[in-house]
Amino acid sequence: WDMTVLKVYDKYYSKAEKAVERLQKSTLEKSFIHNRLKEGNILFNYGRISIIDWDYMTVGSPLWDLAFFINRYKRKNAFYAHNKGLNYLNMEDILGAYSKNNYLTENQIEDLQAVIDYPRQFISVIGEIYRKSRKFIPVGLKMKLDEMAEQVDFEL
């Protein structure tokens, strides 16, 4: 697994640096956010939308929720659809749909892109491995590392 990390470390480090540099200039508005917004936490029932599982709720920018949702979609759906030659939503499609109900300024779009580009999952997995000084890592973490290595250059 060390070789997997070494192959992609520089790219993810560079993405993190650029994202942090952009976000330090940001003036993102803050409110309560879900912080783990994914398709399984959004329920549609009789024309109403409900969001469940608020156990990771925190204060932050609503753009963080949108970025988390987009990154999960990118990682779990778009990458594989792209490789199979199937249609998938690109960033323009996603932002177009989102903007129908939530106007985004150019600055907000740049901030959103920085949050999307920040390699949150990579940093989390690497942190978990190295914090515990593991000689052996569970299969699930190894699979996440392999997936991230495979997707490091994929953009929506």
Can you annotate each of these PLM segments?
Residues 122-156:
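ATP/Mg2+ or Mg2+-diphosphate-binding catalytic cores
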Residues 1-32, 93:
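ATP-dependent phospho-/nucleotidyl transfer catalytic cores
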Residues 14, 18-21, 42-43, 47-50, ...:
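Short helix-capping and hinge/turn segments at secondary-structure transitions, especially at repeat
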